[in-house]
């Protein structure tokens, strides 16, 4: 127990829908908290929630984690952020925010730190749901984010690599031109998409092959415009 009230219990459920992205559904005291905001929310991808900078990166310095989104870019369609921090032997979730200005009215949650860390660790290690192209997508994302030359040459930053169970061999790269902060800073931006097919070989070798293809490829030939800020009236060239 704490001076501010009862501690909650956290469970992180990985949901693989028939179509769409894999979701992490945070369940607090048996209640799916993403079912409470307006209809249409989907849990965020495990790479975002459980990866670097996600729920496991907890100390006394608060940081935001995106727990849910709808689709497209978050300023357009909305997303759900929570601020995560450590207070003594507790982990606190509060400061809920929706960049699109919609509802983000959720209460503060407090978890016992040891139990919280154990649950996040368990969920991060659970890969039983993953299919081969999903593994390739994760490895490819790591390579591209570490390749500053590719990002500079393409004048883009990688937002995500999508793959879905209904098209298990297809990868879709989501890129933002000129960079990921453009939308937040109010600068012109474009969302670009690149479709790739993953082979059935070793995932690490497939990721290397696709990264090499992108490194030697031309953005104008490989990418399509998927979305844009109001600043752009015509297709990006």
Regions inferred by a protein language model and the residue ranges of each:
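Amphipathic, interaction-prone secondary-structure segments
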Residues: 19-20, 43, 51-83, 148-188
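Short hydrophobic/aromatic-rich beta-strand segments that constitute the beta-sheet cores
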Residues: 91-95
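Surface-exposed beta-loop interaction hotspot
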Residues: 96-151
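Preference for solvent-exposed, low-hydrophobicity sequence contexts
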Residues: 154-237
């Amino acid at each position: 127990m704490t001076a501010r009230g009862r501690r909650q219990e956290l469970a992180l459920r990985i949901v693989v829908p028939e179509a769409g992205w894999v979701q992490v559904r945070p369940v607090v005291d048996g209640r799916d908290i993403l079912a409470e905001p307006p209809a249409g929310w989907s849990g965020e991808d495990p790479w975002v929630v459980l990866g670097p900078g996600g729920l496991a990166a907890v100390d006394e310095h608060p940081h935001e984690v995106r727990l849910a989104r709808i689709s497209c870019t978050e300023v357009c369609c909305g997303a759900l952020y929570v601020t995560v921090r450590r207070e003594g032997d507790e982990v606190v979730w509060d400061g809920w925010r929706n960049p699109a200005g919609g509802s983000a009215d959720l209460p503060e949650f407090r978890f016992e730190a040891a139990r919280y860390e154990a649950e996040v660790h368990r969920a991060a290690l659970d890969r039983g749901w993953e299919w081969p192209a999903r593994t390739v997508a994760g490895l490819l994302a790591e390579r591209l984010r570490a390749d500053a030359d590719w990002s500079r040459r393409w004048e883009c930053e990688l937002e995500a690599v999508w793959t879905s169970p209904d098209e298990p061999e297809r990868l879709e790269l989501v890129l933002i031109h000129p960079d990921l902060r453009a939308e937040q800073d109010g600068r012109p931006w474009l969302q670009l998409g690149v479709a790739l097919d993953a082979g059935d070989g070793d995932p690490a070798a497939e990721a290397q092959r696709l990264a090499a293809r992108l490194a030697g490829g031309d953005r104008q030939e490989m990418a399509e415009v998927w979305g844009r800020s109001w600043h752009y009236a015509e297709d990006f060239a």
